Amino acid sequence: MIKTKNKKDKWIKLICGASNEDIVAIEDLCAIYTAAGVDYIDVAAEESIVYAAKKGIDWAKKVFKNSPGLMISISDGNDIHFRKAKFDPSKCPPSCPRPCEKVCPTFAIDNFGIKKSKCYGCGRCLNSCPLNLISEYEYNLSKNDLASTLQKIRPNAVEIHTEINRLDSFTKVVSILKSCETKLDKISISCGLNQSFKKAQEPDDLLKALWERYEILNELDIPLIWQLDGRPMSGDLAPTTSRDAVKLFEKIGSDLPPGLIQLAGGTNEKTHELLNSNNLPDGIAFGSAARKIMQPLIEFAHINNKKLYEYPEIMGLAIKKAQKFLEPWKSSSFK
């Protein structure tokens, strides 16, 4: 039987990006947010990326003694979290104002196209091109490679990205998790409402899907996290983007299966203002918003071929920015 909710089990998660391969930036991000006090860090299921994340965590552990759990993201099918953008730069007219370059939050676009390692699939560039030259492609770990990857990486936790209508595929992924016998502290199930379907999905559809997945996971005896993905990978960094996650939590939070509840998908520094202090989730996950405020500092270090933590003053500034960003979730009302 899966353990039920422990009211003291509150946490903050940093999302580095399920398709983010920017190893140098990931090392810096993990160092910064480990120092700032996050409880989990979620990265792509790739050995070199996990190695970079651990290097950043280890640096901060020596100085700040915090030790977040390491989570990897996997998917049971095609998913917007597992994509990248591409275009042929030879087709760009010389006179183009390059709106794609201006909207990219990770500076992945230049005159040579899109740097694969820096693109995490946010989608902001897809509709910015006046000639519609930019397309997306899938970047995902195959089910055939999942077991061996888990055994090599040995993460503390796994997050399975799923969609309402993918129960069979979800079942196969869980079967692989069972077979590889990797010891996990938690399993997170990330799902939201996919409005690209011909028939709009409703919160009750999501609730039914999560209970179906609970029945499949119930025999594993591993604590579960239900991640309500409000506005997944919208590419929108406006303060109001967190409303969808909060509304979803208010609608179905009390009826979810046993486990812990986490908000994601558009979460940012304003999310706490939208929540009722008497009805808070167990966890909060930050992706684009947490990375965006660090990107200029990280880019400065990388231009000079250094890690950000090799600049003590700038690293100190980055940690203070991260602490301020996380401050509402570190307060007694949340923790």
Region spans (language model):
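Surface-exposed amphipathic alpha-helices with a cationic face
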Residues: 2-6, 54-61, 105, 174-182, ...
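Short helix-terminating capping/connector loops at secondary-structure junctions
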Residues: 6-8, 62-69, 182-184, 218-222
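Active-site mouth loops of central-metabolism enzymes
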Residues: 9-25, 74-94, 117, 133-143, ...
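Conserved mixed alpha/beta catalytic, RNA-binding, or beta-rich assembly cores of soluble enzyme
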Residues: 16-21, 25-27, 38-39, 45, ...
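Glycine-rich, positively charged N-terminal anion/phosphate-binding segment
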Residues: 27, 46-64
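Conserved, mostly hydrophobic/aromatic
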Residues: 33, 53, 158
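Non-catalytic positions within long, well-ordered alpha-helices that form the structural scaffold/packing
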Residues: 34, 93, 101, 105, ...
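Iron-sulfur cluster-binding cysteine motifs and their immediate structural context
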Residues: 96-115, 124-141
